[in-house]
Structures are given as C-alpha cells and as structure tokens.
Design a protein with these regions (language model features):
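Primarily recognizes the serine-hydrolase "nucleophile elbow" in alpha/beta-hydrolase
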Residues: 97-163
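Serine-hydrolase catalytic machinery in alpha/beta-hydrolase-like enzymes
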Residues: 16, 20-114, 123, 204-214, ...
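The conserved beta1-alpha1 loop
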Residues: 43-47, 143, 169
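C-terminal catalytic histidine-bearing segment of alpha/beta-hydrolase fold enzymes
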Residues: 192-238
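Alpha/beta-hydrolase-fold catalytic nucleophile elbow
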Residues: 77, 142-143, 197-198
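Conserved alpha/beta-hydrolase "acid-adjacent" motif
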Residues: 174-180
Length: 238
C-alpha cells in the first residue's frame, strides 16, 4: 500500500508564488504583460541538482519568455531546496507541483498552459500533465532523465501522456540515450517530437572543439533549440 501523501497547504503554495513573483520581477521577465490570449503562461520546473535561481534556469527562463512570447514564465523551488535536503523521489513532488500549476493557471484562465521542466522537473511535469484537472497544452522536456540510477528505462509517465510533448536532448546525454528515447516515443500515444542538440550533454553544454568544428557558439546552439520549441508550440496551437 502506497504511503499517504502529505497535503500541500495553501500557505506553502502562496509563499512559493510570492517568492517566484519577486524573483521574476527583479529579473525583468514578467513585468511586461502581453495582452494577447494566444500568449502562453509557462510553468518551468528545475532539476534535482540546482534551484530556480541557478544561472542555467535564469538563462533558459529568459530564452523561453522571448521565444514563446509568454505572458509569464514562472519558476519555483520544490520544498526540499529550502530545507537543504536531497531530492526525494519524483512521485513525492507531484502534489506540490500540481497545486502550484493550478495556482498559476487560475491567474490566466484564457491563456494556453505550457509545462516545461529541466531533467527531474521534466519528469514531474509529465506526471502532473497526466492529472485530469490539469489542462496543459504542451509539455516541454529539457534533458529528460529516461535512464534511472540502475539503468532502468523510466517511461511510465511518458506512456500515460495525451498532451503534445517535445523532448530537447543532447546526443551525449548519458541519462537519455537517443536510441532508447526513440523506442519510447514510438510507444507514446501523445503527439511527440525531439530536437537534438548535437554534441550536447545533459544540460546541452557543447565542448569547445565541437563548437569550433560546427562554427557555432553555445549561445547560438541554445537559441536554435528554443526556436525549435517555439515552432512546436506554434504548430500545436493552430
């Protein structure tokens, strides 16, 4: 019998929402509201090893906000971050994540909801998107951790999805071998696609030699990935 999950309190969600809003305003991301109902609201979840205030998360929040013309890109921290504890199993983060998504979605009921996650955050985002009371338009997985610590393929949340899903993966990401991902994608019932960052690792970092050989910068490589995300979101919105 599965252990009973502790119910997330309203005060916990409100506190995280307030913290996120203050960070976003200081970063200049969501201070400008776009009066266009086609502009999505994006809830962006961090990975296991770094909070929403990490350089990578801030950079990608900016990229997503610009490329998707989002009315708001909201990041947050899972509770274990403030407690300085190691991350729990992804399943134990679903309730908090889901409650937070509902809180943000209620602010923008007429705008498409896009769930984005980095690594562990993408896995939890997929679990949240499966819930009946979450009406997401798409899920974007940035470095999906398909391979578990003991090598098991963790595809259960993906096979349950019915929401259009995009994977952005580095082909040197040991946590998500592209061959394994391709096999899972064929079994998924949801519309899905993948964008491969050539020579990118789990965080899409490309080695200096490979960048020189390709005649591209790291920034340009990441912008190409974000442009692909914007194209995907635009296509499913038609």
């Amino acid at each position: 019998m599965a252990p009973k999950r502790r119910r997330t309190t309203e005060s916990e969600i409100n506190q995280v929402t307030q913290n996120c809003s203050s960070r976003i305003t200081r970063a200049g991301i969501s201070s400008k509201k776009i009066n266009n109902n086609s502009s999505p609201v994006v809830v962006f979840a961090h990975g296991a090893g770094a909070p929403s205030s990490s350089e990578w998360m801030i950079r990608w929040r900016n990229l997503l906000a610009d490329a998707l013309k989002a009315i708001e890109v909201v990041t947050f921290d899972y509770p274990y971050i403030s407690k300085r504890k190691p991350p729990p199993k992804a399943e134990k983060l679903v309730e908090f994540h889901s409650d937070f998504v509902k809180k943000i979605a209620s602010k923008y009921p007429k705008h498409p909801l896009i769930l984005v996650g980095k690594s562990m955050g993408s896995r939890v985002s997929c679990m949240v998107a499966v819930e009946n009371d979450i009406k997401a338009s798409a899920v974007i997985c940035l470095g999906y951790p398909l391979k578990g610590t003991k090598g098991a393929i963790r595809d259960e949340p993906l096979l349950q999805l019915s929401v259009p899903t995009m994977f952005v993966q580095g082909n040197k990401d040991g946590l998500c071998p592209l061959g394994s991902l391709e096999g899972v994608r064929k079994k998924m019932k949801a519309l899905n696609t993948v964008y491969v960052v050539e020579n990118g690792d789990h965080s899409f970092k490309i080695g200096k030699k490979n960048l020189e050989m390709a005649g591209i910068t790291q920034e340009e490589a990441e912008r190409l990935a974000v442009q692909a995300i914007a194209t995907f979101v635009s296509q499913i919105s038609k």
